[in-house]
Swiss-Prot record:
The lineage of its organism: Eukaryota, Metazoa, Chordata, Craniata, Vertebrata. Pfam families: Cir_N. PANTHER family: LEUKOCYTE RECEPTOR CLUSTER LRC MEMBER 1 (PTHR22093), LEUKOCYTE RECEPTOR CLUSTER MEMBER 1 (PTHR22093:SF0). This is Leukocyte receptor cluster member 1 homolog. InterPro entries: CIR_N_dom, LENG1-like. The modification Phosphoserine is found at S244. Keywords: Coiled coil, Phosphoprotein. Residues 88-110, 147-163, 179-190, 200-215 have a biased composition (Basic and acidic residues). Residues 16-37, 88-263 are annotated as: Disordered. Residues 16-46, 89-116 form a coiled coil. It comes from Bos taurus.
Length: 263
């Protein structure tokens, strides 16, 4: 703290120490004044309360004596009796008009749902029953679906599924119709009447030629003079030989899998 003792902002400076002491003394005085005011306010409030209590206690005997001395006064004291007696001479309005006005106001409040009696439901408070309590109209024109129902039907996923199923059934029906037509076509081409002699003779000659060619091929194969049969080119990629650029005859051929025999 001995660093720069000549500065005005130094903590241990005489002027600063005196200023702090003055501030502390002023704060103590303000706190004492605040406490004195609080005590004075509490004292005044207590004094006022006791005065009112004493005044009320002094009024009770005088009021009881006045009630006992008043002739024919057995009920409570009415302070506004004179004003009521003076107001008897005042002319009153039309009772019928006031009643009609009150009924009109009550009817409007009931229509708006503002006025309801105890134990009365919301449906009873309305002048017209709600739509769900109205009976269905018999023989009238059927009203179309509302906007909410149309939106619900359009967004219904079940309706979308049924539409796609209908398209699928229609497509399968069309394909089935084509197949039945194709199957029925040969039946239409079949002659209805018995074959003629020329047709029978042509069929017989065709069969004999086929048998003769088969027999000649068998004899040529047995005698060794048959020409080598050309093997048909395999079209299925899974049954063809593996590709070999230099020795295609040595390429391994995949094993042929026969289809399973049905029992």
């Amino acid at each position: 703290m001995n660093i720069l003792p000549k500065k005005s902002w130094h903590v241990r400076n005489k002027d600063n120490v005196a200023r702090v002491r003055r501030d502390e003394a002023r704060a103590r005085e303000e706190e004492k004044e605040r406490e004195r005011r609080v005590l004075l306010a509490q004292q005044e409030a207590r004094t006022e309360f006791l005065r009112k209590k004493a005044r009320h206690q002094n009024w009770l005997p005088a009021l009881e004596a006045a009630e006992a001395g008043a002739p024919g006064s057995s009920g409570p004291v009415d302070l506004f009796r004179e004003l009521l007696e003076e107001g008897k001479a005042v002319t009153k309005g039309n009772k019928e008009y006031e009643e009609e006005k009150r009924q009109e106001k009550e009817r409007q409040e009931k229509a708006l749902g503002i006025l309801t009696y105890l134990g009365q439901s919301a449906a009873e408070a309305q002048t017209q029953p709600p739509w769900y309590q109205l009976p269905p109209r018999q023989g009238g024109p059927a009203s179309g679906p509302g906007p909410d129902e149309r939106i619900k039907s359009r967004l219904d996923p079940l309706r979308e599924m049924q539409k796609h199923l209908g398209k699928k059934r229609k497509h399968s029906g069309d394909s089935g119709g084509h197949s039945t037509k194709e199957k029925a076509a040969p039946e239409k081409q079949r002659p209805k009447g018995p074959p003629s002699l020329e047709q029978l003779r042509a069929d017989r000659l065709r069969r004999e030629a086929a048998e003769r060619a088969r027999a000649e091929a068998l004899l040529a194969r047995v005698g060794g003079t048959a020409a080598p049969e050309e093997q048909p080119e395999e079209v299925d990629e899974r049954r063809r030989r593996y590709n070999s650029q230099f020795n295609p005859q040595l390429a391994r051929r995949p094993r042929r899998q026969d289809p399973p025999v049905a029992p």
